[in-house]
Amino acid sequence: MLRSLVGSEMCIRDSDNCEEIGPEMEQCIGEAYFFRACYYYRLFVNYGEVTWLTKVLDPIQEQMERPRNSRLEVADSILADLDIAIEHLNTQTNSSTMRVHKDVARALKSEVALFEGTWEKYHRAKNTPFYDKKVTDEKISSYLRQAADAAKDVIDEGVWSISKGDPNTAYRDLFITLDLSHNPEVLWWKKYDAANNIGHSVTRYLNKGGGTCGASASLVDDYLTKEGKPFVGSERDKAKVMYGDELSPDLRDPRLSQTICMPGQDLRPNGEFVFKLPPLNEESRNQNTTGYSILKYVEYNTTYIPTIDGEGKSQAPAIQFRYADILLNYAEALAELDGAANASKIKEALRPLRERVGMPEMDFDREFNTDPDYPFNKLDKYIQAVRRERRIEKALEGSRLQDILRWAAADILIIGKTPTGALFKGSSLETAYGESLQEGENLFLTGTPSDSKRYIIPFNNKHYPNGWQFNPERDYLLPIQPRMLSLTGNQWVQNPGW
């Protein structure tokens, strides 16, 4: 990471010595500022305060001995770099070059500003050690407005849109389309080419429903019903008895059955493997751990045979920013600023995500989940709605932990929680597997043997009798390596609690 920062710094420094003037030079300068902001943002998320540098240092101890800048200083500097990047980067109407452009920088700016605005708001509210003590309500609102404004700039251009198709396949298709160059939703992405040894192994591990992983019941239950209502109570309990019923697009938001495997779906080309049940009794990479097998990213329709079982031969693209991110950032920033006043704008922003899969328009009252077991049941209804929409639309895309951290929500979502999967005892899974699964050996369940309903636990929970643990006075940031403390002459102070 630090080497990458040095590369960006050198490019910015040396641009002053370049005699060439023109669009290519402008693009290079914009990219240098973008990537400096991007690398600092990654450090910022992980470690909080860091030293902001605007020149390349000589490898001399004295030059390394600098204190960390405050959170607000670092956040403001990242946003300033992105403003410069936006000024210099070119405008693009598709992602065919796979280079950053103005709207990619705006997308990152909206993410950074939303991250810091919500981080400061919620960490200050819970009085954790991690917010900037100089932050004010006005400063928090400023970040949220910047997040909304950057996203709105992209929206107002009218260049990008949500890709559409069959409501029961369009969402899934986005993540397994190998060439997204002219997809109207994708701002920036990475293309894989397995024939030239540029690939990954997602399809290999997931194309029989295993992968030594699985989705949680918490995620599955958060998808609304087809009518746009919370999936709770007797309706939920009844749908869990026959495996797969709760996943059906006739009952639930169709994004669920395009993210989690449902009986009858192809996982390999030409009908070679049709999903029936999660492989709970398999071993190693072929096992599913929760009863909910992952479908998203599985290239069931590949024509490149090595993708099916080859290590490093999967080619599903890596999307960095898509228009859905813009809409979600805009909606959340508006909800945080004033959900009631911005209700119509929030609904309008998120409507395309619902329309893609044939879901009804957002209705904050209809969707408000008051179930006592729902973790955000006391949240403002506007914020609850946009948080749910973010979780559903971006499921399994790697952003959930960062959301939990910026919302200071570990006390609600992590501490003391035991993650669970599908209903086992009291469902058709129990009948299907019979004696092939033995509790305490290759099956772990909630409750006790006398309970009529027991859910899958994805690990041996005897090692976690009190559920997941997370120290809210320490774990929102990573520890700084002792080597870094030494290099800075102890000008850097270790993060709280470490």
Model-derived regions: residue spans:
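An aromatic- and glycine-enriched ligand-binding surface/loop that stacks and positions planar moieties
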Residues: M1, V50, D83-I84, R99-R106, ...
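Single conserved hydrophobic/aromatic residue that forms the stacking wall/gate
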Residues: L2-I12
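Structural signature of alpha-solenoid helical repeat junctions
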Residues: I21-C28, F35, V74, N94-H101, ...
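Long, intrinsically disordered, low-complexity segments
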Residues: S77, P167-K229, K313, P317-A318, ...
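C-terminal substrate/ligand-recognition segments
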Residues: D245-R356, P496-W498
